[in-house]
Amino acid sequence: MNKIQCESCKTKLCASKVPIFASLDRDHLSKVVSKISHLSFNKGEAICVEGDLSNSLVIINQGQVKLTKVTKEGKEQIIRVLSPGDFFGELSLFNEKEKYNFSAYALSSVKICSLSKEAMHTILIENPEISVKILTEVSKRLMEAENLAQNLATNDADIRVASLISEFGEKYGHNTDLGIEVNLPMNREDMANYIGVTRETISRKLTKLQDSGVISLVGNKTLIIRDSSRLNDFM
């Protein structure tokens, strides 16, 4: 972990990239930016560990971050993948001595913006609409967590893999002449952990989808969704 100076952020107002701050005018954004601490992490480095005291709002500025828990069997379970503009630690804003109930690891080189609980309280008092946006995001995450739990409990591997590709397509995809090109935020092992299958299973299912003409695999880090309708049929 490295502390970094980020004067460019202060002039470009990087906080405007964060959905919960998007409605603020330039003066209020400047106040937010003045309270931000900037940190950088290398790929694989822990940003926080389950059980650590949570006393700040952490915003992803660059890169991807995975949130994980350890199962009773001692295996890693990825519960969420965060991208620039996403955040965690919001529950600490409303609870005293809140502890992280997950660990966060950098999936790539990562830069974060951290706002202390005290700084966020000041921001929320001056801009109460941000509280509503945070609670809306928390509600969305609870629904996603329920969907993930149901997916892991009831759906077979074909549905899980298709759902994962669809999710990544929505979050990381962009349209090309060949279809929706997706830059995968994680490797095969992490993808397998995310949906509760083995690495061999996810490789086999991806090959099956490619052979069916639904997707094309471009190395290990990119895929192209060639037929979204047929992908939905697998779900």
Model-based region annotation:
Residues 170-235:
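Phosphate-/nucleic-acid-contacting segments
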